[in-house]
């Protein structure tokens, strides 16, 4: 029997973010500043996936994401799974939950919002409505679909 070949090399210890929708890997790298840790980061783009057709994957050597950071990922890749690796084995597999609130990640699309002209940090309340992720601005109280809100 032939041993399966990995598309992206295994890591001994760290974090694997799997099942990222194809094309979202770079956004996650940038938004979560995963390259700033100074650790080896391996990224696979448009890899074959049985459930998604194609996917991205990110492996970060020597870094473990906390629950808060992992759940922030749900805003970019709701179906992603965060695996904690130790001695080349998955020791924890986390399915993501949307956070109740998110700050300093997105910009409010409302140009009249106080978050644009005042020295305040953007802040949104996160809700799921009819299967869609919605963000309500803390300052202007307008609600937007996740896709219509730009990254900060």
From Swiss-Prot:
GO CC terms in record: aspartate carbamoyltransferase complex
MF annotations from Gene Ontology: metal ion binding
Annotated residues for binding of Zn(2+): 108, 113, 137, 140
Cofactor(s), names only, from the UniProt record: Zn(2+)
InterPro entries: Asp_carbamoyltransf_reg_N, Asp_carbamoylTrfase_reg, Asp_carbamoyltrfase_reg_C, Asp_carbatrfase_reg_C_sf, Asp_carbatrfase_reg_N_sf
Keyword check for Zinc: yes
GO biological process: 'de novo' pyrimidine nucleobase biosynthetic process; pyrimidine nucleotide biosynthetic process
Domain of life assignment: Bacteria
Cofactor descriptive note: Binds 1 zinc ion per subunit.
Keyword annotations of the record: Metal-binding, Pyrimidine biosynthesis, Zinc
Quaternary assembly: Contains catalytic and regulatory chains.
Family listed: Belongs to the PyrI family.
Function as written in the Swiss-Prot or TrEMBL entry: Involved in allosteric regulation of aspartate carbamoyltransferase.
HAMAP family: Asp_carb_tr_reg
Name of the molecule in the record: Aspartate carbamoyltransferase regulatory chain
